Amino acid sequence: QSLEQASRTPWKDTVRWSTHLWAPIRRDLVPIDDTKLNSEFRGLKSRLKFRTFTALSMPTAWFAGLRMDKLDHESCVTSLPGGWRTQNPFKTMYWAVQGMGAELATGAAPFAMSRSMPEKLRMFVVGTEAKFVKRAKGRITFTCNDVAAAREAIEESMETGEAVEKDFFSIGKDSSGEVVSEWVFKWNFLVIDRT
């Protein structure tokens, strides 16, 4: 059966044809559960749970003292302390450590969404850009305001069955509110039906 013929069948609204697998995939997948999502947000914001999570899943982040300061349906804020655990030989924060905090600010919300739906979400960074504006000293805070855009990308993949790539922005600021670094992370999302 051709794709054109398939589009004329009565079940066209509940099935689409994958361009890579040539097999029917259901479009009526269960959306992200907001109750579970709020619970995941609370868990990641809990200092004890987050420290345990990083110790087990991201030990470098645990050692560096990465912290989740805010996570909701609009934005995510992470921070890292200054000091010997995060510094470079010039006594400022090492650029790769900044990248860790900036990346988590863009990825924490999609990670929570992946745990709030029955389908499997494959997500990974496929590209990044950074601009270093000022020497990073002391506690640096990273803010991403793209949580709604992340949800839209995941829901688009859920609906189409195709991978979706999106750029998310993270801004690093020092304790005086001055920008020290600007980051762009290109995320790739693919929702896979478990059935």
Where are these regions (language model features)?
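Residues located in well-ordered beta-strands
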Residues: 67, 129-131, 143-145, 171, ...
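HotDog/MaoC-like acyl-thioester-processing domains
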Residues: 2, 8-42, 136-137, 147-195
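Hot-dog-fold acyl-thioester-processing enzymes
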Residues: 85-107, 120
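Short structured motifs
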Residues: 62-68, 126-132, 153-155
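Hydrophobic beta-strand-centered segment that forms part of the acyl-chain substrate-binding groove
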Residues: 109-148
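Catalytic strand-loop segment that frames the active site of acyl-thioester-processing enzymes
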Residues: 63-93
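Short Pro/Gly-enriched beta-strand edge/turn motifs at strand-loop
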Residues: 46-55, 60-61, 151-153
